[in-house]
């Protein structure tokens, strides 16, 4: 009787959480607004590329926006430039040095007879008066945005030592109450452009997550007469497969680093527990066995451990599980509520939602040093997801009662808003490198 009541309560809570998040309609591209950058952001100049005005996409403008959005760089407005060199021969270093600019990017876009473009760029160090790198791309016109993001990735890595994540995607769920199928699963470029709708449904969609190669996604859908099921969707072929539809809860899927397994939450035996599903053999392995609610599993990079949320100590806390011997130990001790964890690619930082003074914030725990820092100042944060380079965290929150996405650097020094043009967005998931 106790288990039955617990299962019913959990299901009611799950559905209530989803439906209460949707207040107004959502659709279209995400907007990008840097609300707080580093005080020591690096001054950089992206000179408008020669030939960009007549192109379908202005590659130089996209590169400038990417670098600005990272919060690590402070681009010089083009109107403030004393000169606009197109190449190394035209570079006048003193024109940028006097303005305090440390790096300069020049480039050109030349239309080819095939209809595509030759896009070249170069990066210069003003202090050393030296060219650091240069590259040339020959994309079709339809891939100019991809080239721009690739250039941003290369420059970001050259100057920070960290791979750029501008060519990645953001997966999220929206809701439009005026649509016959109001729930939508969508993804967009990391800068909010080129939105693609994967699924439309008249029932809630939850917990989207990427496969390690970025070719598939898994998610929870209530489309089967309101019952939750876990689906895998191939982005290239649009084929879908239902991989979990047991009685009770089917939730919180997460791909193993090798892409061979899904960790998930099931209540098929009466209590919400963590399971592992072999995607090839469909063999299901139970990993936890506790009277508390165990949910929200996330794989660690080594593929041998998971972190998950459990109520076994009273309130929700984060625990670490060894999948081989099934040993469990608690890893979060700050306050009475810690949930919805994610892990940086190097396994060093644990990111999760922490409750403090009635507010729900994103916190970052250093697993090596044991330190913990709250990195957001909003009060209804949920679903943090770490970028594949470990530098940023995207999460859902609320502004004026409406759901938006925001991103924050792992040290809390850079903050970016990604509100929808028309309404609510929830459940973000940052893609792997693509």
UniProtKB/Swiss-Prot annotation:
Coiled coil: none annotated. InterPro entries: 6-blade_b-propeller_TolB-like (IPR011042), PD40 (IPR011659), Tol-Pal_TolB (IPR014167), TolB_N (IPR007195). It comes from the Bacteria. GO terms for cellular component: periplasmic space. The keyword Signal applies. It is found in: Periplasm. Residues 1-28 form the signal peptide. Keywords: Cell cycle, Cell division, Periplasm, Signal. GO terms for biological process: cell division; protein import. Disulfide bonds: none annotated. HAMAP family: TolB. The Tol-Pal system is composed of five core proteins: the inner membrane proteins TolA, TolQ and TolR, the periplasmic protein TolB and the outer membrane protein Pal. They form a network linking the inner and outer membranes and the peptidoglycan layer. Part of the Tol-Pal system, which plays a role in outer membrane invagination during cell division and is important for maintaining outer membrane integrity. Belongs to the TolB family. This is Tol-Pal system protein TolB.
């Amino acid at each position: 009787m106790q288990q039955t009541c617990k299962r019913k309560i959990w299901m009611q809570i799950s559905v209530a959480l989803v439906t209460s998040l949707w207040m107004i309609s959502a659709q279209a591209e995400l907007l990008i607004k840097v609300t707080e950058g580093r005080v020591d952001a690096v001054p950089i100049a992206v000179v408008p590329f020669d030939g960009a005005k007549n192109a379908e996409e202005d590659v130089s403008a996209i590169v400038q926006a990417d670098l600005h959005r990272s919060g690590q760089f402070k681009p010089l407005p083009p109107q403030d430039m004393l000169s606009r060199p197109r190449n190394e021969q035209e570079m006048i270093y003193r024109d940028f040095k006097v303005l305090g600019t440390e790096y300069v990017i020049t480039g050109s876009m030349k239309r080819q007879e095939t209809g595509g473009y030759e896009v070249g760029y170069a990066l210069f160090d003003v202090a050393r008066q030296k060219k650091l790198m240069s590259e040339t791309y020959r994309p079709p016109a339809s891939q100019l945005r991809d080239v721009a993001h690739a250039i941003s990735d290369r420059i970001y890595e050259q100057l920070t030592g960290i791979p750029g994540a501008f060519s990645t995607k953001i997966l999220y769920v929206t809701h439009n109450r005026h649509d016959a199928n109001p729930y939508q699963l969508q993804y967009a470029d990391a800068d909010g452009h080129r939105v693609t709708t994967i699924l439309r449904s008249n029932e809630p969609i939850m917990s989207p997550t990427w496969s390690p190669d970025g070719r598939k996604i898994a998610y929870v859908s209530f489309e089967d007469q309101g019952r939750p099921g876990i689906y895998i969707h191939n982005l290239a072929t649009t084929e879908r497969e239902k991989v979990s539809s047991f009685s009770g809860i089917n939730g919180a899927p997460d791909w193993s680093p090798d892409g061979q397994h899904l960790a998930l939450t099931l209540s098929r035996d009466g209590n919400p527990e963590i399971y592992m599903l072999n995607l090839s053999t469909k063999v299901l392995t139970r990993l936890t066995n506790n009277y508390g609610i165990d949910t929200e599993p996330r794989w660690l990079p080594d593929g041998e451990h998971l972190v998950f949320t459990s109520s076994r100590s009273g309130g929700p806390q984060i625990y670490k599980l060894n999948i081989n011997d099934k040993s469990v130990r608690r890893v979060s001790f700050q306050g009475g509520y810690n949930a919805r964890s994610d892990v940086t690619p190097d396994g060093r930082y644990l990111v999760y939602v922490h409750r403090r003074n009635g507010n729900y914030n994103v916190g970052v725990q250093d697993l090596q040093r044991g330190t913990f820092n709250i990195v957001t100042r909003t009060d209804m944060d949920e679903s943090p997801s770490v970028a594949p380079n470990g530098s940023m965290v995207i999460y859902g929150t609320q502004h004026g009662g409406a759901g938006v996405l925001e991103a924050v650097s792992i040290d809390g020094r850079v903050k970016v808003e990604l509100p929808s043009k028309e309404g609510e967005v929830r459940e973000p998931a940052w893609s792997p490198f693509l």
